[in-house]
Amino acid sequence: MSLFGNTTTGGGGLFGNTTTPTQTTGGGLFGNTTTGGGLFGNTATPTTGGGGLFGNTATPTLTTGGGGGLFGNTTAPTTGGGGLFGNTPTQTTGGGLFGNTATGGGGLFGNTQQQQQQQQQQQQQQQQQQQQQPSTSLFSQSSLGSQSSLGSQSSLGSQSSLGSQSSLGSFGQTQQPQTSSLFGNLQQQQQLQQPQRSIIEQKLYDFMQSISPNSLNCRFLYWFYNYQANGQLVDPNSIPKPPNVTVDQWAYALSNNPDPSILIPVAAKSFDDLINRRMKQEETIIALDQNTQEALKRMRDLENHLNFHIHTQLEMMRKKQIELIQRYIEVWSNLEIYQSKGKTFTTSEERIMKKIYELFEEINQPNSIKSKVEEISNQLKLGSMEKEKIKYEISPEAVEPLYNLLKNMTISIERITNELEIAVKDAQILKNELYQLKKC
């Protein structure tokens, strides 16, 4: 085998071995090799063919059986011949670099096909042989389905990846006239995935809109009603609609307003709105509590002020009244003395005189009412001190009637004391008058 020549006998080389002697005709730089299986494939019978720089013509020869090469095998009769720019084979099947084809072998840039009917018959034979005797390649599997090509569609009568009509497949074997490609399948898958993605994206968008407080389609919506500040009346038509609610929702809120004259609808569409509303209510409650405490403080101050001034004024009025009574008694006594001057005592006057003396003696006696009152008060004080020592537990139901009793007793004692003081004063006045009468 020479660089530009032909080989006359079969031998083992880098690209294959032959099992029987072969004869070749013609050979150039890109000519023919004899036959044989090697790195790229094996054949069981001799083949003939020749190749020149720009192509050759070959006579049909038959091969039997199929062998597996690194990238493919031949399964049908072939006539090998290929030039640099092409040749005219007749019904051949040959192994390409990346796969097997059902029709003639190819040159580097393309081949011409002949006899479409015979090609179809050979294709059917190849399909049957592939079913019975499948061949394998490094980058593809043999099947009855469609095969893929690197960036192009490979089939009978279709364009290859190099832009020429050939039966060379890439990474696979073609047995049926179906057109498919690696990128075509990806495009089909992407086209199928695009509707699915759009549906999922639409569902996600709808879900986000249903929970977004700024969306009109938010499902979380509840209406609260706030009081108008400063107690002013509200005009429902002058209330602006919030931007994140629809017209129907706003109309529903206005229609369900319990008192449109003082209440304003407020929409709550999220937990943040509820939290803000709760914080505002707490602030309002704190402000109301502060106002209440201030009002109570002012009321206490006013009560203390009134009690102090009224009590002092009442005491002053009582003192004035007592002075007036004393003056009146003094005037009346002087008048009576002047009128009764030189007259004798009557029986009634004598009785009054006796009563006055008796009252005066009772007051000064140790068993008088005054002493009894002091004794009772001392006993109460001692009883309270003993209670503090013993620490008896008295129920509120028992304390209340005792308190009322003591209160009534204290009031009665004060009244008796006042009456006694008045009686003592009257007795003193009478005593003075009697003393003056005696002088006269």
From Swiss-Prot:
Molecular functions per Gene Ontology: structural constituent of nuclear pore
Annotated compartments: Nucleus, Nuclear pore complex
A Gene Ontology BP annotation from the UniProt entry: NLS-bearing protein import into nucleus
Region of interest (Disordered), ranges: 1-188
Each Sequence repeat, start to end: 4-5, 15-16, 30-31, 40-41, 54-55, 71-72, 85-86, 98-99, 109-110, 171-172, 183-184
Gly residues bias: start-end ranges: 25-40, 93-109
Composition bias type Low complexity, residue spans: 110-176
Stretch list, region 11 X 2 AA repeats of F-G: 4-184
One Pfam family it belongs to: Nup54
GO cellular component, one term: nuclear pore central transport channel
Top-level taxon in the UniProt lineage: Eukaryota
Record keywords, A-Z: mRNA transport, Nuclear pore complex, Nucleus, Protein transport, Repeat, Translocation, Transport
Functional note: Probable component of the nuclear pore complex, a complex required for the trafficking across the nuclear membrane.
Entry comment, domain topic: Contains FG repeats.
Protein family per UniProt: Belongs to the NUP54 family.
PANTHER family, sorted: NUCLEOPORIN P54
Protein name: Nuclear pore complex protein nup54
Organism placement in taxonomy: Eukaryota, Amoebozoa, Evosea, Eumycetozoa, Dictyostelia
